[in-house]
């Protein structure tokens, strides 16, 4: 086992990186923490990151760019007959929507619209005559 107290800052950094830990700058205030971390990493069994396996499709080419279809296949395979659908925002129910997309028969005053978009009513100033 390596004597961590005798390592230079560079060597300490190199050993930590080799064991899969990315340290910050090694300073007098952080060195003790990194020495302790190196001892922990040396004492524990080697850690291997999990291998991400690409899901296989039972039908069709794996090189296809049809990622949405692939996702639907995965969801159907996991939970039966679930399908994903793209939804759009229903602008007719949004009072802040543009006038041509609002529900017919509703009217908004300019002050209401400014309040909806700016979060507050504008100040009114009276111009002296």
Swiss-Prot record:
InterPro entries to which the protein is assigned, alphabetical: LEM/LEM-like_dom_sf, LEM_dom, LEM_domain
Per its UniProt record, what CDD domains does this chain match?
LEM_LAP2_LEMD1
Q: Which organism is it from?
A: Mus musculus
> In what ranges is there compositional bias, type Basic and acidic residues?
83-97
Alphabetized SUPFAM superfamilies for the sequence: LEM domain
The record's region (Disordered) falls at 45-129
Annotated ranges, domain LEM: 1-45
**What is the designated name of this protein?**
LEM domain-containing protein 1
- Alphabetical list of Gene3D superfamilies matching this protein: 1.10.720.40
């Amino acid at each position: 086992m390596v004597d961590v107290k005798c390592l230079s800052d560079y060597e300490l950094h190199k050993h930590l990186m080799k064991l899969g830990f990315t340290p910050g700058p090694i300073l007098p205030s952080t060195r003790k923490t990194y020495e302790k971390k190196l001892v922990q990493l040396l004492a524990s069994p080697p850690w291997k990151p999990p291998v991400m396996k690409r899901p296989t499709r039972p039908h069709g080419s794996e090189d296809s760019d049809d990622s949405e279809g692939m996702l639907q296949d995965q969801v159907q395979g996991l939970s039966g007959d679930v399908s994903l659908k793209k939804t759009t925002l229903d602008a007719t129910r949004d009072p802040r929507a543009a006038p041509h997309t609002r529900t017919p028969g509703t009217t908004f005053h300019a002050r209401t619209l400014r309040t909806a978009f700016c979060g507050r009513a504008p100040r009114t100033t009276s111009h002296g005559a």
